[in-house]
């Protein structure tokens, strides 16, 4: 019997005056609650339909979705001994390559959980993750489920000798290392902006921010046009992802590297690459 408490559990058309997305800036009241109640091991918040979740450590500190993904992957693969590949959207941390083995691949798909579901339905998948807090597991249903994810976090902690999630996270961080990741929304007006990523998919730069480009992954829209381009760079968990919006003059730029400064540099290089497009 594990004591628990629910806050903001009542139905609210306005989600108590906040956006329903379970990200750090929307969970300030939850963080304040945990700061005032040290008896809780951690906290989990879901969005309105409970298919995504966000995690707070005891004490109210935000645990990023990327860190949550690594912890859940470790639990599913190493504690629960679940067989199969790991599916991740292109914006999820490259740290998941640490779980790659001869009989376990990492399947990289474009952003959107429906692409993870497609892989889960094909079979041979242990779990699937998207950067926005949607997690799915082969022993459940081929869909993201925030409540199932919360229960797995409880189970994960029960497998350990740790009393709190912050203690558990500190131990695992020694094993897996720090994750340095960020994303920005880049407003860019260009009459032929939807041609930018197809251009660079056909003319790949040899290096970005002085790192050699080892591989590229391209993702197509429903119309068959490249709307996502990921550059895999030399080093561990180092990459740059560019995604274009078809409905607004916007590019989403994502990066992971070995330090905050490096990630900032990669994001700047991503914006510079977009700016460099010249359709003469």
What role is predicted for each listed range?
Residues 12-19, 73-76, 116-121:
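Short, charged, surface-exposed secondary-structure boundary motifs
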Residues 26-33, 68, 72, 115:
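Well-ordered alpha-helical segments embedded in enzymatic catalytic cores
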Residues 8-12, 67-70, 110-115, 133:
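Short, acidic/turn-prone active-site loops that include or flank metal/cofactor-
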Residues 51-71, 96-97:
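Short Gly/Thr/Asp-enriched flexible loops that form oxyanion-binding sites at enzyme active sites
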Residues 42, 81-254, 260-280:
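Phosphate-binding and adjacent anionic-ligand microenvironments
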Residues 1-7, 98-103:
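Short helix-loop-beta junction
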Residues 2-55:
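N-terminal small/polar loop signature for handling phosphorylated ligands or for N-terminal nucleophile
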Residues 6-8, 61-80, 146-154:
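Gly/Ser/Thr-rich active-site loops/lids in small-molecule metabolic enzymes
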């Amino acid at each position: 019997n594990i004591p628990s408490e629910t806050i903001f559990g009542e139905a609210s058309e306005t989600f108590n005056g906040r956006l329903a997305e379970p990200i750090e800036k929307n969970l300030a009241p939850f963080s304040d609650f945990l700061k005032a109640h040290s008896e809780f091991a951690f906290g989990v918040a879901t969005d309105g339909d409970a298919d995504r979740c966000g995690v707070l450590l005891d004490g109210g500190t935000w645990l990023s979705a990327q860190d949550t993904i690594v912890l859940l992957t470790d639990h599913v693969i190493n504690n629960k001994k679940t067989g199969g590949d790991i599916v991740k959207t292109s914006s999820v941390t490259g740290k998941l390559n640490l779980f790659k083995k001869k009989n376990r691949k990492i399947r990289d798909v474009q952003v959107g959980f429906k692409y993870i579901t497609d892989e889960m339905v094909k079979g041979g998948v242990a779990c699937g993750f998207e950067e926005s807090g949607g997690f799915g597991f082969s022993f459940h249903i081929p869909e993201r489920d925030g409540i199932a994810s919360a229960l797995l976090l409880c189970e994960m902690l029960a497998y350990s000798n740790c009393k709190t999630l912050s203690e558990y996270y500190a131990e695992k961080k020694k094993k897996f290392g720090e994750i340095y990741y960020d994303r920005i929304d880049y407003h860019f007006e260009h009459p032929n902006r939807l041609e930018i990523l197809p251009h660079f998919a056909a003319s790949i730069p040899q290096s970005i921010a002085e790192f050699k480009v080892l591989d590229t992954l391209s993702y197509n829209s429903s119309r068959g046009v490249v709307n996502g381009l990921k550059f895999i760079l030399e080093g561990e968990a180092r990459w740059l992802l560019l995604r274009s919006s078809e409905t607004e003059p916007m590019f989403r730029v994502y990066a992971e590297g070995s330090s905050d400064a490096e990630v900032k540099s990669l994001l700047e290089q991503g914006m510079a690459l977009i700016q460099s497009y010249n359709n003469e």
